[in-house]
């Protein structure tokens, strides 16, 4: 069987951190690669929150749109190998978010998102069952942002994804790292850009 490839020029450390978190949350997570620009690859990874996370690296992918096991990709990045595993295209849940066209709606201070996540975690501990936090908590809208006639709700699942994937800097992070998140929208898609990656959610049609 053929093997997919990804050659990384820079950004491997950040991608490794995201993949390690994603695999820690879901050992069966799937990664998908898009050649965003001639020398930039956007790596998407599934999460248990019905949210797709993404991070960009400088490099080239052997086959644009290829999907592989996130665990296989993680091991390859750790080892510095270009071979990243066998194709898993059939396991990817739906379409990728658009590559461009998103409208910036608002900028949120990191501490606001962290406070929301803390409250959400407390509720999750209080009401979680054997299957984890209840679906109603994940769907709950915790913020509404709007600009130029466009309004979107931010569900708790996006907040949980940002914090559980380590996309938000901690208090000890260097001061040159931004302390805000940007919320953007395009059609049914909502995107939150954090300092260490982005998360996407389809607001009207579930990815999973």
Where are these regions (language model features)?
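A broadly used, surface-exposed interaction patch
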Residues: 52-85
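N-terminal ordered "arm"
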Residues: 1-57
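Long, compositionally biased intrinsically disordered terminal regions
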Residues: 73-208
């Amino acid at each position: 069987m053929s093997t997919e490839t990804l050659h990384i020029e820079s950004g491997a450390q950040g991608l490794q951190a995201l993949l390690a978190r994603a695999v820690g949350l879901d050992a069966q997570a799937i990664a998908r690669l898009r050649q965003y620009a001639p020398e930039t690859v956007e790596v998407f990874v599934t999460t248990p929150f019905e949210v797709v996370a993404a991070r960009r690296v400088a490099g080239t992918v052997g086959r644009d749109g290829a999907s592989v096991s996130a665990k296989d990709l993680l091991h390859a990045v750790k080892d510095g190998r270009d071979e990243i595993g066998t194709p898993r295209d059939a396991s990817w849940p739906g379409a990728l978010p658009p590559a461009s066209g998103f409208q910036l709606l608002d900028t949120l201070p990191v501490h606001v998102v962290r406070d929301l996540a803390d409250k959400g975690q407390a509720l999750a501990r209080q009401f979680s069952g054997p299957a984890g936090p209840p679906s109603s908590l994940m769907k709950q809208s915790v913020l509404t942002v709007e600009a130029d006639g466009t309004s979107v709700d931010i569900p708790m699942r996006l907040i949980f994804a940002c914090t559980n994937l380590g996309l938000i800097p901690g208090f000890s992070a260097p001061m040159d790292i931004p302390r805000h998140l940007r919320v953007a929208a395009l059609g049914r898609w909502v995107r939150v850009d954090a300092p260490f990656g982005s998360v996407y959610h389809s607001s009207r049609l579930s990815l999973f």
